[in-house]
């Protein structure tokens, strides 16, 4: 559950735009493996008290449904992606069944072949596999996520409610066997903190790499939503999302779009609610989320991101 402040009592949140501005003004220009240089900063923290609103960026519209109606909004695609990974999705077909359609450029036959994967397969080192089928020395995959929820319910005061997307042998290169994932996990290091006395739940999230104008927009949706979801199924009130980024960057071909977004006025964050009838984390779907009080300053716009 979550208790939002009335919309007119919320304070406009500038943390996302502050990060964009920091990268623009102090970022170091570096080469990347994508062939496009980037400005980057190392180490950035944000804290979102969820009573002040759900962190959906207002610098551009991500919740408007496409005019053709064939696919969900970007907001609901992000939620579909989250629900897919929470259920162990590993292929583009799996993701599309949950309503996420943006993985196509990373799962082409040519790209997958580089890592010994069939077309459409994100690989055994991807998020869904790590969350639900983490490999073990004993040979039996370990379901991190299910055990995490059970542990929160059984031992709420424990300090090790943690989740990791990182399976080193499938991600790191330079070892026998090679990489087995189309994109090394950029996000997904989660630590859940429960105050059993106050009945509140805070989630801290670490992201190793953030494409600030594009990927980060949807990652903020992911982990704010996950905070609400875990709180609902374990019986706590969602309190705060604490967000840490190791490497935050803007590609040089995104600079014009970023400057346009920064020219907008800061807005209050919207209200996002969940279907209160859902009591199983793995039963959530994108359609169980509703957004209101969302007032973006720019229409939906496509921003380049290297593959």
Placement of each model-derived feature along the sequence:
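Terminal, non-catalytic protein-protein interaction segments that mediate quaternary/complex assembly
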Residues: 1-307
């Amino acid at each position: 559950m979550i208790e939002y402040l009335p919309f007119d009592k919320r304070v406009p949140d500038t943390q996302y735009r502050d990060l964009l501005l920091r990268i623009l003004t102090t970022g170091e220009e570096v080469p990347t493996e994508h062939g496009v240089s980037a400005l980057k900063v190392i180490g950035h923290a944000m804290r979102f008290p969820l009573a002040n609103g759900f962190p959906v960026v207002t610098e551009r519209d991500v919740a408007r449904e496409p005019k053709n109606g064939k696919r969900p909004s970007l907001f609901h695609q992000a939620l579909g992606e989250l629900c897919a990974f929470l259920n162990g999705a590993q292929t583009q077909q799996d993701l599309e069944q949950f309503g996420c359609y943006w993985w196509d450029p990373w799962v082409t036959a040519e790209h997958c072949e580089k890592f010994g994967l069939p077309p459409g397969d994100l690989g055994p080192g991807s998020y869904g596999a790590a969350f639900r089928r983490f490999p073990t020395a004993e040979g039996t995959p370990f379901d991190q996520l299910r055990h995490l929820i059970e542990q929160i319910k059984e031992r709420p005061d424990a300090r090790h409610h943690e989740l990791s997307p990182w399976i080193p042998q499938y991600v790191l290169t330079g070892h026998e066997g090679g990489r087995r994932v189309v994109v090394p996990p950029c996000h997904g290091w989660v630590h859940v903190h429960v105050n059993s006395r106050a009945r509140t739940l805070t989630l801290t999230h670490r992201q190793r790499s953030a494409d600030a104008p594009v990927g980060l927009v949807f990652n903020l949706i992911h982990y704010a939503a996950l905070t609400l979801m875990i709180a609902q199924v374990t019986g706590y009130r969602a309190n705060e999302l604490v967000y840490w980024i190791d490497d935050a960057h803007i590609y040089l071909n995104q600079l014009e779009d970023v400057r346009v977004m920064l020219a907008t006025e800061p807005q209050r964050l919207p209200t996002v609610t969940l279907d209160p009838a859902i009591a199983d984390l793995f039963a959530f779907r994108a359609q169980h989320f509703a957004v209101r009080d969302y007032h973006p300053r720019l229409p939906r716009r496509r921003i380049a991101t290297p593959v």
